[in-house]
Amino acid sequence: LEMGVDIMHDYLSRFGFGMDATLDVGGALPGLLPSRDWKRGMRNEPWYPGDSVNMSIGQGFFLATPLQLATATSLVANRGEWVQPRMLKDVMGDTALESVLEPEYLEDLTIDNHDTWEYVVDSMEDVMHGRRGTARGAAEGADYRMAGKTGTAQVFSLAEDEEYDAEEIRERLRDHALFIGFAPADDPRIVVSVIVENGGSGSGTAAPVARAMFDAWLKEFNGQDAIISRAEGEQP
């Protein structure tokens, strides 16, 4: 509440929310990053403190795509360096990549205290490897360290005096399971955003999917020896 919607809107926009930050992804949606002006224009209502509370946890009017979640996560992994999503990797022949793909146009995100990045990354590592980490089960047995955050997306609203019971709710109304993360934590090579529709638990449903994606990319595509050498601090 002390931060307020204006500051939240400013910083969330720097992480790519409320816009299409892709370079060549046709049909990418901007989501919805609400503001005072947006609510006044769309609903003819003022912005209430409760709206800020909802927005702070990604609920209420706020909407984000899985790609936007992955993009924002990459900013954390890269300590503020932008990598705008694109489908095209390279161009064969004499044509230069720059001639068919617009250059990245978003400025890197700088903060006054760089240690803040490390605090966030360390906290995300604890989610995966800490004694109380919500996704520690998904990271069990890994020979590399990963960073992540579990979550849920509410599908429908409960009454104030009603408790959520997944067993008694029809499947199509159950919470969506969410997970965002990257690996290796100390030398990021892959960022993922996972949503399992009506999956319920981010830690029990979405995080294991992300772990499988990490393993596939780091071990099968890039080679097990390379990831082990990076984990030991050697040059790949």
Regions found by a protein language model. Give the residues of each.
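Beta-lactam-recognizing serine transpeptidase/beta-lactamase-like catalytic domain environment
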Residues: 1-193, 236
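C-terminal soluble interaction/assembly domains
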Residues: 193-196, 209
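Short beta-strands and strand-coil junctions in structured, solvent-facing domains, enriched
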Residues: 199-201
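Short, gly/Ser/Thr-rich active-site loops of penicillin-recognizing serine hydrolases
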Residues: 97-108, 208-236
